[in-house]
Regions:
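Class I SAM-dependent methyltransferase SAM/SAH-binding core
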Residues: 59-116
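A short acidic, Gly/Pro-enriched loop at the edge of an enzyme's catalytic core
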Residues: 114-127
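Residues that mark the start of a beta-strand
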Residues: 60-62, 123, 151
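Conserved alpha-helix/loop element of class I SAM-dependent methyltransferases that forms part
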Residues: 24-59
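A short glycine-rich, Lys/Arg-flanked "PGG" loop and its adjoining helix->strand segment in the class I
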Residues: 140-155
């Protein structure tokens, strides 16, 4: 078993045991986001400034290692076209739970971000990658793939 498989199983276990980053947003939080009241975390301590995102409606967003039902549902509520890629089955289940509750079908992809991403070149306007790169051995291939799937002028957070 390679280290990314071990990581996925570990994260699955954390989520099953109530891990903070595996608890999906509430219906109330989703509704507030639809009305423009929202905040998401990229790191554990500070909400990302809205200015970093620009207009969200219609923006194609990849949540890279961003399962858990926290950020991607907020972006969806704001009108973005979102895809979430995560290696944790439990994190993707949380995305699906929020989608079912809120009446949309999330685009969930179970994949390893250390491998070539299963998307065409220039597919996304923005990639949102909350704390996850500390769990992998080599960053350069991940950043190279992000550059490939970002549209010209796209943003990686």
């Amino acid at each position: 078993m390679n280290y990314t498989d071990i990581n996925a199983k570990t994260v699955d276990s954390w989520v099953q045991n109530g891990w903070k980053w595996g608890r999906p947003i509430s219906h109330e939080t989703f509704e507030k986001a639809k009305n423009g009241e929202w905040g998401v975390y990229l790191t554990p301590t500070k909400i990302v400034p809205h200015e970093w995102f620009g207009e969200m409606r219609g923006k194609k967003i990849l949540g890279l290692a961003s399962g858990g039902g926290q950020q991607i549902p907020v972006f969806t509520a704001l009108g973005a076209d979102c895809t979430v890629l995560d290696y944790s089955t439990e994190q993707l289940k949380r995305e699906e739970e929020v989608g079912k509750r809120e009446g949309y079908t999330p685009k969930c992809v179970r994949a390893d971000m250390t491998k070539p991403l299963p998307f065409a070149d220039e597919s996304f306007d923005l990639i949102f990658n909350p704390v996850s790169n500390c769990y992998i051995e080599e960053l350069e291939p991940v950043w190279r793939e992000c550059a490939r799937v970002l549209k010209p002028g796209g943003v990686l957070l």
